[in-house]
Amino acid sequence: MGAGAGGLSLRGARLSPEERANSSKSRAIDRALSKDHTDDLNRFKILLLGTAESGKSTIFRQMRVLHLDGYAKEDALEYLSIIHSNCMEALTQLVEACSAFGILHDITVQEDVDRFEGFKKKLRDPEGLVIPVVIGRCMDRVWQSSSMQMCYETRRFRFALLDSAKFMDNIVRLTEDNYVPTIQDIVHCRISTTGINEIAFNHKKMDFKMVDVGGQRSERRKWIHCFDNVDMILFIVSMSDYDQLDPEDHKYNRMKQSYEIFKTIVHCDLFRHASIVLFLNKYDVFVEKLKTSPLRRSFKSYDGDNSEESARDFIKKLFRRCITDRHKFFVFETTATDTGNIDLVFGSAVAHIVNENLRSAGLHE
């Protein structure tokens, strides 16, 4: 009987060029995945959390500005329609506020308001919104009018328009034909985070990985997937929310809702080894709002005066009560749109954590 009938054929052990290439590619992928896993373990991992509109995604963008190459022209242009949408939303809110409070416009201003409203009705694709130059000029005239300025100055806190004022002041520039968003335009724009965004960067010879997840209630269930091996929780609270209702549930105060989420996070067993950093954000707006909206109106347990220091300390203590290990908790006042402020505060937070870790290991006095 021939060898081919009962013996071992070597024909199947030979690989085609395509198979060899695929095998080589597979091994390369395995090595890359292994390297990524090792690199990930060696990085200082930060989980960025907070409720919607707290400013956490602004801080995420600041990390790109501070520690990477910022935004190339092509990347910056992706924010154009977002910035234009912010402008449309801001003026729409102001027009509605004028109507709600019975503030009347001059005839010429009302004509521009009607022109603006007509443009909105004709919009086919809000996602790719680009405001034409002529409408930008029209919006500027409405914004600069005495009736609109009076509405803004007296009702701005009701409509949370402080961030948008920067855009409205620059609406002519923002709607020029050759407009390319600047770094500050990108930092100031408002956009809801959906899903999970990651950024890796180096800061003072340390490798970091920051993960930003959506702040809306529907996005919070995704946080659990980011919990593995977290070194630091960076939780963002909007200080200016102390007198605002939660847009997702009007029964709740926004800051109290943020407090409840913070309490849940810090008591989660998955974070028992993580440092907790709290950014009390929009601090500049908070200071301004206190002049017309006392903290006591929203927090009945507050018995201090209406000074910035007393109100700030009350909120700090409120959140600090959730913490059991005080050595791993750090709190800072921030203004997310101020690049210099975020650079300084982030550096301080990291330095505090590193020093505390060294002290815990007996390597630092």
UniProtKB/Swiss-Prot annotation:
Top-rank taxon: Eukaryota
Region G4 motif: start-end pairs: 277-284
SUPFAM superfamilies in the record: P-loop containing nucleoside triphosphate hydrolases (SSF52540), Transducin (alpha subunit), insertion domain (SSF47895)
Pfam families linked: G-alpha
Record: residues binding Mg(2+): 57, 193
Record region (G3 motif): 208-217
InterPro entries, per database record: Gprotein_alpha_su, GproteinA_insert, P-loop_NTPase
Domain G-alpha: 42-364
Region span, G1 motif: 45-58
Keywords annotated in UniProt: GTP-binding, Lipoprotein, Magnesium, Metal-binding, Myristate, Nucleotide-binding, Transducer
Region (G5 motif): 334-339
Chain positions covered by the region annotation G2 motif: 185-193
Gene Ontology biological-process annotations: adenylate cyclase-modulating G protein-coupled receptor signaling pathway
Binding-site residues, GTP: 50-57, 187-193, 212-216, 281-284, 336
Primary role: Guanine nucleotide-binding proteins (G proteins) are involved as modulators or transducers in various transmembrane signaling systems.
Protein name: Guanine nucleotide-binding protein alpha-6 subunit
